[in-house]
């Protein structure tokens, strides 16, 4: 069996990444597959956005399409609550720091970063919670069994370490020629191949089977290449 790494470029506020959440969960179940998360910082700095009518009218059609294509749930508290809360701000930096902190706070637990990302996405898209706020993120970490060490790790991952992480992710995107989020890429023997996930949205079992097959192969796959899957651009969903 070959050593294989699956790189996942994501953003916590990318709706299509939420649509691909079952694919990430399935990948984490594949024995022998090393899954690495790379937050891209889609809505950070000048791209942070306060919630308002413009943002709501922009994201809702995309969210409804995501729900239709992937089966992922969107809650009333998100559509009628968070998206109408003009005091809320969409900022990718804090939730990405929380994903990094989940890994840092419990290095021995494989998949904890992915679990944190999934919990953050559910909190946002189903429960309508403010995932850019530190107390909310610490509460989500506590739900996953992370204690005081998570708060310390969260603070340690913020600021310059987080900016460095975003820069590393952007360099990887450039290397892959990735147009946006989500992007999955397999690495074997230093060679990177972007996977076309479009046919697998809403089909996590088929995706898991593909990855298991890749672990047994010495070469590529007919799933490699072709960016057919819908994406969020680096600075927002399209």
Located regions from the model:
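Alpha-helical interaction segments
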Residues: 6, 114-115, 196-197
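Short pre-active-site segment immediately N-terminal to redox-active cysteine/selenocysteine motifs
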Residues: 10-13
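Generic hydrophobic/packing signal
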Residues: 15, 33, 43, 91, ...
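C-terminal cap of thioredoxin/glutaredoxin-like
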Residues: 21-28, 119-238
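Extreme N-terminal starter segment of soluble prokaryotic enzymes
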Residues: 1-7
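Structural alpha/beta surface segment adjacent to cysteine/selenocysteine redox centers
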Residues: 18-124, 225-232, 237
């Amino acid at each position: 069996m070959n050593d294989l790494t699956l790189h996942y470029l994501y953003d916590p506020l990318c709706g299509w990444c939420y649509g691909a959440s079952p694919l990430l969960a399935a990948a984490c179940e594949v024995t022998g597959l090393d899954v690495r998360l790379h937050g891209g910082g889609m809505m950070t700095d000048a791209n942070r956005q306060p919630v308002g009518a413009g943002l709501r009218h922009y994201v809702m059609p995309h969210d409804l399409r995501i729900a239709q294509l992937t089966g992922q749930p969107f809650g009333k508290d998100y559509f009628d609550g968070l998206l109408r809360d003009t005091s809320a701000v969409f900022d990718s930096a804090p939730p990405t720091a929380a994903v990094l902190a989940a890994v840092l706070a419990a290095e021995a637990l494989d998949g904890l970063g992915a679990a944190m990302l999934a919990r953050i996405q559910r909190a946002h898209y189903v429960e309508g919670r403010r995932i850019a706020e530190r107390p909310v993120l610490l509460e989500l970490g506590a739900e996953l069994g992370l204690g005081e060490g998570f708060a310390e790790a969260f603070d340690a991952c913020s600021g310059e370490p987080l900016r460095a992480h975003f820069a590393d992710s952007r360099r990887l995107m450039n290397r892959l020629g990735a147009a946006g989020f989500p992007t999955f890429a397999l690495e074997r023997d230093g060679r990177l191949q972007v996977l076309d996930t479009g046919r697998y949205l809403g089909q996590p079992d088929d995706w898991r089977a593909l990855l298991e097959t890749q672990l047994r192969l010495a070469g590529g796959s007919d799933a490699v290449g072709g960016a057919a899957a819908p994406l969020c651009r680096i600075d927002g969903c399209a």
